[in-house]
Structures are given as C-alpha cells and as structure tokens.
Amino acid sequence: MAIRYVRKIGDEVLRKKAKPVTEINSHILTILEDMAQTMYLNDGVGLAANQIGVLRRLVVIDVGEGLLELINPEIVYEEGEQVGAEGCLSIPGVVGEVKRPKKVKVKYLDREGKEREIEGEDLLARALCHEIDHLNGVLFIDKAIRFLDEEEKEQVKEV
Ligand code: ZN
C-alpha cells in the first residue's frame, strides 16, 4: 500500500470521465487500498480514483461507519433534497453550499465482483453524489449555490 498524491484543481485528470473497471484484479485492489490510505491520511470522508490520477470508476468512502469500497458505482434512485456545506481534498480551503438529494441508492460491485446496492441518507448521500460526480469530471464548485467566507468556514465541518 502507498499514499498517493491528491491531484488539485487545475489538473486536467479531475475533468476527465473515468472508465468502468472490466476486471477486478490485484492492480485494482491495490489502487482501492491506496485510495483508502490516502483518504484517511488526509482526513477525508471520500476519494475518487481521478483524484489520485487514475481514470477508473473506483470510489472509497468512510463517513464514520466503516470503509466502503465501490467499483463502477451508479446512482439508481434518488429522493428529496438537502443543502449543505461541502469541501473537497482536491480544492483545499474552499467550502460551498451544494444542493444534493436527501437519499440515494447506489448500485456497485464489491472487491469480489459481487453486485451490491447501498442506500445513503444525509452525509452518506452527499458523499456518494460528490464522489460519483468526480468519476464524471464534475466538481462540487460547479454545483455550489454559494461559497462560504472565512468566518463561516470555521463553524462548518468540511466533508
Ligand atoms: Zn472531492
């Protein structure tokens, strides 16, 4: 396992669409493990493969309920609406309010290649949407309805 460098805004890899994983081999599992390690080191709640310069549809998330590894994640259902503050490891120091679904259902493959589904609400729904956006080259700043100033940022926990 290795810590990977997190690509920052301006790096074109963040604007590219990641390709589906066609074979879950040891290379893919190593990338997932590196992503998890990199996410934890940076105190993030999620990371998409684009952020470490890999254009494959891989996401890791941990909102405090354990590590989720998602291969080829896809939103299959969404419901409601929430507006909340969001940040991104690729855009340090910026926090913006983003409108997201209140609840989402995501279909994905686990590391054994088994098809699974996860339902997320609130922070988990937000993290799932944020990371899947990354796989499509979309950043939260594209969707932010308002950016927070320094004083407001101190009162908000970044996600
Ligand atoms: Zn991000």
From Swiss-Prot:
Reactions accelerated catalytically: N-terminal N-formyl-L-methionyl-[peptide] + H2O = N-terminal L-methionyl-[peptide] + formate
Requisite cofactors: Fe(2+)
InterPro entries from the UniProt entry: Peptide_deformylase (IPR023635), Peptide_deformylase_sf (IPR036821)
Key word Membrane present: no
Keywords: Hydrolase, Iron, Metal-binding, Protein biosynthesis
Organism whose genome encodes this protein: Thermoanaerobacter pseudethanolicus (strain ATCC 33223 / 39E) (Clostridium thermohydrosulfuricum)
Co-factor note (free text): Binds 1 Fe(2+) ion.
Entry-linked CDD domains: Pep_deformylase
Record-given protein name: Peptide deformylase
Family recorded in the similarity comment: Belongs to the polypeptide deformylase family.
Pfam families to which the protein is assigned, alphabetical: Pep_deformylase
Superkingdom field: Bacteria
